[in-house]
Amino acid sequence: MKSIENIDEFKNLLNPPSKIYYKGNLELLKARKIAVIGSRKMSVYTKNCLLELVALLKKAKICVVSGGALGVDIQAAKIAYPQTIAVFANGLDEVYPKANANEILNIYENALALSENEANYKAKPYDFLLRNRLIIALSEVIIIAQADLKSGSMQSARLALSMNKPIYVLPHRKNESEGTNLLLATKKANLIYDFEEFVKMFGEIYPEQKEDELLNFLKHEDDLEKVLQKFGDKVYEYELEGLVEIFGVKIKTCV
């Protein structure tokens, strides 16, 4: 675990952290960032919405920020991975919640985890509220996917309003996600009608790049005969294009 003195987005907070501890890729801080937060007990409908919406955010090279909690937070992080930042209330040597351990360890390795608390710090209830201010400060806008009236997500909504951060919510039926419905009714949040149009406000949606089967195969095989058996004349086409190099009975990629 390493530390940095501060992050630009935190400097204008009334109570900025004195130090930020991190694991992972600090380059993600340079990306446009959108928070995706919400209920720990999300509905199947919310999960399906996230699968579509967050996948589009990822294609637009937007980094998804969350708290790594159960439910909406970790679902958004999994879809966005490795373009995701998780802000934790606990120290980063304390993996919490344990149910998300695999996903959190992946974030440590290939995405970015942040905390204002030292390595082995065990979070207390008020630390989660303090953590939420960092999520809001870090993000350009806040998406609250689902929330009850009395929830941490509604406290985050109040924080977002105090920081003049736009809030967006998903459409929900009456008596579902009453917190986000209230934000809409009181004109404190905007409704995401169309996922693609929403994402286009923040960046171009790039087509998903498919891994090249032949080049991928060469990552673990350099025997020319075996490669020819599988891909035939395509191997020589790739050689002419300068994508592969053949020397004797061996072959390797040039990219």
Give the ranges of each region predicted by the language model.
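Glycine-biased, small-residue-rich flexible motifs in mid-sequence functional cores and linkers
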Residues: 2-255
